[in-house]
Amino acid sequence: VYKRQLPAGERPPCDFNLISRYFYNCPAEDASHTIDAETTADLDLNAVFERIDRTTSKVGQQCLYARIRTLRGQEDAEAFGRSTDCFSRNGELAASCTESLSRLTDEDAYGLQNLIFDTPAKVRYFAWVYPLTLLAVATLLAAPFYPLSLLLFMAIFAVNLYIHYSNKLNVSLYGSAVKQLSLALRTARELAVEEVPGTEEATGQIRQVAEVERRSRVVGTQGDSANELAAIAWLFIELAKVAFNIEVILFQRFIGSITARRDAIHGMFRFIGETDAAISVARLRSETQTCRPQFVDGKYLKAEQVVHPLIDGCVPNTLVLDGTGLLLTGSNMSGKTTFIRTLVLNALTAETLDICFAGSYTAPYMRLLSSIRISDDIAEGTSYYLQDVS
């Protein structure tokens, strides 16, 4: 079912500068809590992510990373668990979706989220574009009757040439993102045909993104230098684009369509990413001893046979807290901090991925904070206490 996947140890190293970009850009308005950089470091969360990541696409990788650092409440975790169940029960569906998701494995796919969050490029000198285009058409039509109008046309062409190539960089910058948008649209359509979880909401978003994709075809179009006839044809097309500002006008419309439909692009992005993340967790369940968490009200925690996902051959531990706290003591190097990390990591995966690395896990849905890797700094005049409370 997952033949396209590599075992975790054989997968290429994660580039967290690219993977985390979506998490840092995405507004967390619907989140009850996000895992900050300090807690991420305390829990070795990036290393944990590398161990549990089974995603196929770069979009899925970004969404899985954002999910594991964003707590959106018990209902969201349980809904994600139901999506995971869907792929756990239906291996053929998971395999078919994995095939579709494999289109978005190129590193350029990390840049798809730029279309959602980046400030749109501004077309330079756009106020002059329509008047110059009308003048170019008028002088060309007048040429058979007033040949001298060709001189005016050449002057206008020179100005349009400057405008055209002044904006060429903006057009080229969108080239790879537009290619990934087309691939993502095709992927989303195929996932929708399979009626994976989230299809009903995504259908309208896919339709809106298709309108953006149609307007994006002007971006990144280049001539075929390997074919002389094609190169000649492309040259004449390029001259027409320059003379009548065709590329500049279409690019402006493309930017406008992206701005107007960012929510739809984001919705489609999440539809693809959440599907990939759910398949990833389904695969993780099939490979690793895990359980489904039970969320309860009140001050009660029971974790049986809980282990740390980064430690091979980890000795399981059991903890029950019923209305009480815990003071953990022991000698140096006895595993106190590792045990704390184990509990917090399992609480985190329970509240974000609806799985735990344990025999059973019962606890309330709660905020997660840590302060483990702190130190004093004489040069900056900070003590352990100040670092802890700041």
Positions of PLM-derived features:
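Flexible beta-alpha connector loops of hexameric P-loop NTPases
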Residues: S370-D388
